[in-house]
Amino acid sequence: MAEKQTAKRNRREEILQSLALMLESSDGSQRITTAKLAASVGVSEAALYRHFPSKTRMFDSLIEFIEDSLITRINLILKDEKDTSARLRLIVLLILGFGERNPGLTRILTGHALMFEQDRLQGRINQLFERIEAQLRQVLREKRMREGEGYATDETLLASQLLAFCEGMLSRFVRSEFKYRPTDDFDARWPLVAAQLQ
């Protein structure tokens, strides 16, 4: 029985990995059908549906992975790092690095892969970005408590500016067909971004 569950879990992971790879390839800029996905995995469409009730559920699973990966790591940064500037830099670098290491998932983050899918999926991505923005805002607000002085500019504006930078770099990565990596020249870009944090 345990072997059957493991085999089923492995097949589910294989399906999700194939979907992510298809999103990374030129197929990712078009609608991905279950027929194409089944062919990529080497199974029938019926076999896909034994593991996932719908393609939407497959995307849900990928979004769950994105959420878990980013939020868990952001929480680790907040636990381990106390300096506000370092926290912000590490969170931004985390988001950009995650996108760079997972190009197919970056198409989901930017919404490109979800254009042909249910609106609910885009809503989940919107919620994820709202959670990240809220965490950035909290880090910015905590500066006053941690370091004795805050920012002259409203923390809501600063948090949205940081997130807009991340979203812009991820969109550029997707638009360039993954040519312009989000972390390229990060050490030169970060001082420009950090200068806005006044």
Curated annotation (Swiss-Prot):
It comes from the Bacteria. It holds the Pfam family TetR_N. One of its GO terms (cellular component) is cytoplasm. Residues 117-144 form a coiled coil. It is found in: Cytoplasm, Nucleoid. HAMAP family: NO_factor_SlmA. Homodimer. Interacts with FtsZ. Required for nucleoid occlusion (NO) phenomenon, which prevents Z-ring formation and cell division over the nucleoid. Acts as a DNA-associated cell division inhibitor that binds simultaneously chromosomal DNA and FtsZ, and disrupts the assembly of FtsZ polymers. SlmA-DNA-binding sequences (SBS) are dispersed on non-Ter regions of the chromosome, preventing FtsZ polymerization at these regions. This is Nucleoid occlusion factor SlmA. It comes from Citrobacter koseri (strain ATCC BAA-895 / CDC 4225-83 / SGSC4696). The gene is slmA.
